Curated annotation (Swiss-Prot):
Subcellular location: Cytoplasm
Keyword NADP recorded: yes
Organism from which the protein derives: Bacillus licheniformis (strain ATCC 14580 / DSM 13 / JCM 2505 / CCUG 7422 / NBRC 12200 / NCIMB 9375 / NCTC 10341 / NRRL NRS-1264 / Gibson 46)
Taxonomic path: Bacteria, Bacillati, Bacillota, Bacilli, Bacillales
Name of the featured protein: Gamma-glutamyl phosphate reductase 1
Superkingdom of the organism of origin: Bacteria
Gene that produces this protein: proA1
Enzyme class: oxidoreductase
Amino acid sequence: MSEVIEKAKKAKVAKEELVHQPTERKNEALSFIAEAIRFKQDEILAENEKDIVRGKEKGFSPALLDRLALTPERLNDIADAVMLLTKLEDPVGETLETIRKDNGLFIENVRVPLGVVGMIYEARPNVTVDAATLCLKTGNAVILRGSSSAINSNKALVRVIREALERSALPEDAVQLIEDTSKETAKQLFTLNDGLDVLIPRGGKNLIDMVVRESTVPVLETGAGNCHIFIDESAQPDMAEQVVINAKTQRPSVCNAIETVLIHKGWAEEHTKALLQKLEEAGVEIRGDEAVCTMLPSAVPARETDWGTEFLAPVVSIKTVAGIDEAIRHIRQYGTRHSEAILTENQENARYFLTSVDAAAVYHNASTRFTDGFEFGYGAEIGISTQKLHARGPMGLKALTSSKYIIKGNGQIRI
């Protein structure tokens, strides 16, 4: 029996036990997990260092190494996020709708767990904890399949989580890690219809596209983040500089960082040069159109492929546009429906942009870096969905539930 099949069977048994666990027991288990992450910090960091060393030997980019790295601060943040989940309302059992029929039937639509959730993801060990704890809070079992680049970190984290579950009333088999990171195990997950209720990919465009293309299991798609900021003609210069610098440089390797800035030509004439200099001082490589390269000779001429690239690095493409309609057309052509922003003092233009742009999150005068489960008050997130069915945007607890109808009667029959 393959590792995938064996662990899927265990997860399936565990999910049947989880549906009977009250919120108090789930929260207790989460508290044990947060405590264990803090207590076993040195052990986790030692295993993470093995992944970092191997990544450097393989020539991983600084952006990839940043996503892979755990630090004491990041582990504390992860533990804090787990504890936050204990304070959030449990969506399972929530009544969505009630109907009382004339014949006496009482119909209730309630939230229920999805069942067994499969997670396939890349070099992000924090996803291991996010996925496991979100699933546990919502009564789901989870099968985790990370990448080979983070295998030591993932094994350490899952070991800590399962040890914490041993102390709790929850089954430790509710959290499974596929340790074989070969392509074969990924393909097995894609077609595990009798073992998985849903599969969630979290990573780069190539991974997500492959899962969507090849999976026969229902997929909750988390999209790549080729995010834009459009600086309208009336944008305040100081605010525009502050928001653009934050959205690009605070953490360039994440999906809600911007990759392209579109600048209204009326704003560009007076203010763009100062913005370009600020970006360059912040260590950002600028790839610009002809107007941008004229203002900043050190800028690299942008190629067509740059407009559609999610750099996940301190690199930004910048283009001047004639107005808001050209900016929206550009976003429609190259955007990934993740997060898009307009900076403007013109309320009509803001309304037009927010209505016209098709994305999971659209912003007016704010950084795209806020598209995040924690920032939205969801605690940790399972991913950011760019699709429209079931869930869209940061997926917190409610996104990991479905619903069912409970009908109560006293002998009614249909005539």
